[in-house]
C-alpha cells in the first residue's frame, strides 16, 4: 500500500503539471498602441506648428520656380538623348544653339510686354514657348517671331568665327547647325517663325511657304515636314475663312514703318543664314 503522504504528493504534482499547461493570458496591448498613436500625432502637430511655416515657404518657392526646373529638365533630357546619337560635345553645342534661339523669343516678347512661358525642349523636334495671351496684331506676332532667328543667326556667326579662328571642326559643325535651323525656320509658313513674321507683310506669302514645305515633304517623307505642312494649311484656311471679319482685318493692319522693318529684317536674316549654309554645302 502507498502511504497517504505519497498519494498527496502525487496528486499535488499532477495538479501542478496541469496548471502549467493552461494558457496564460497575455497583457493587453491596446492601451500601449493608443498611447503611441497619440504621442505620434502630438509630435506631428508640434512639428507642423514649429517648422510648418518654413516647409510651406520652401514648397511655395519651389512651385514659383517650377517653370525653370521643367525647362532645365527638358533641356537636360534633350542633351542626353542627342548624346546617344552625336556624342556629348556636339549634343551640348546644338542644344545650346536651340536655347539661344528660344531666348531671342523670350527677350523680344518681354520687350513688348507679352507674357510667355519658359521654353520646353523636345528631342528631335526642337523647342517651343507658348504665349500666355494672343498678340493684339500682326506686328506683335512678327516681333516675337523675329527674336529667335535673330539670336540664332548671331550665335551661328559667333560659332563660325570662333571655329575658323581655332580650327575647331566641332564648333564649325555647330555653326552650320545654327545656320540651317535659322534658315529652315524662316520658311514663310505657320507655325514656323517665318510664317509668323510675314503676317506683318501679307498672309498671301504663306502660299510660297506651303509650296516649299509640300515639295520637301514629298521628297523626304519627313514626319516633321508633314506636320508643319498640315498646320500651315490649317491656319491658311482659317485666315481665308475670316477674310471678311472686321476684327481679323484689323489684326493684319500694320504701319508702313513696321512693315518696312519686318521686311528688311526678314530678308537679312534669311539671306545671311542661306549664305552660312552655302559655306558648308556649296
Predicted feature locations:
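Hydrophobic transmembrane alpha-helices and their immediate loop junctions
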Residues: 1-282
Amino acid at each position: 500500500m502507498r502511504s497517504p503522504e505519497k498519494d498527496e504528493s502525487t496528486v499535488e504534482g499532477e495538479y501542478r503539471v496541469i496548471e502549467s499547461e493552461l494558457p496564460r493570458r497575455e497583457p493587453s496591448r491596446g492601451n500601449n498602441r493608443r498611447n503611441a498613436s497619440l504621442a505620434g500625432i502630438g509630435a506631428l502637430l508640434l512639428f507642423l506648428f514649429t517648422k510648418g511655416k518654413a516647409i510651406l515657404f520652401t514648397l511655395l518657392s519651389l512651385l514659383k520656380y517650377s517653370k525653370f526646373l521643367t525647362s532645365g529638365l527638358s533641356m537636360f533630357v534633350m542633351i542626353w538623348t542627342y548624346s546617344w546619337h552625336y556624342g556629348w560635345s556636339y549634343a551640348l553645342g546644338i542644344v545650346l544653339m536651340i536655347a539661344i534661339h528660344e531666348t531671342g523669343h523670350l527677350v523680344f516678347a518681354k520687350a513688348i510686354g507679352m507674357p510667355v512661358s519658359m521654353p520646353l525642349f523636345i528631342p528631335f523636334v526642337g523647342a517651343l514657348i507658348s504665349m500666355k495671351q494672343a498678340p493684339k496684331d500682326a506686328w506683335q506676332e512678327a516681333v516675337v517671331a523675329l527674336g529667335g532667328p535673330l539670336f540664332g543667326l548671331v550665335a551661328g556667326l559667333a560659332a563660325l568665327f570662333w571655329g575658323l579662328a581655332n580650327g575647331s571642326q566641332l564648333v564649325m559643325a555647330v555653326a552650320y547647325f545654327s545656320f540651317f535651323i535659322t534658315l529652315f525656320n524662316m520658311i514663310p509658313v505657320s507655325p514656323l517663325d517665318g510664317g509668323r513674321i510675314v503676317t506683318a507683310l501679307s498672309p498671301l506669302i504663306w502660299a510660297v511657304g506651303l509650296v516649299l514645305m509640300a515639295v520637301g515633304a514629298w521628297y523626304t517623307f519627313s514626319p516633321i515636314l508633314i506636320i508643319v505642312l498640315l498646320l500651315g494649311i490649317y491656319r491658311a484656311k482659317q485666315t481665308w475663312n475670316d477674310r471678311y471679319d472686321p476684327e481679323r482685318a484689323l489684326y493684319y493692319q500694320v504701319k508702313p514703318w513696321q512693315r518696312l522693318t519686318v521686311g528688311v529684317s526678314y530678308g537679312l536674316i534669311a539671306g545671311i543664314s542661306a549664305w552660312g549654309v552655302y559655306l558648308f554645302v556649296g
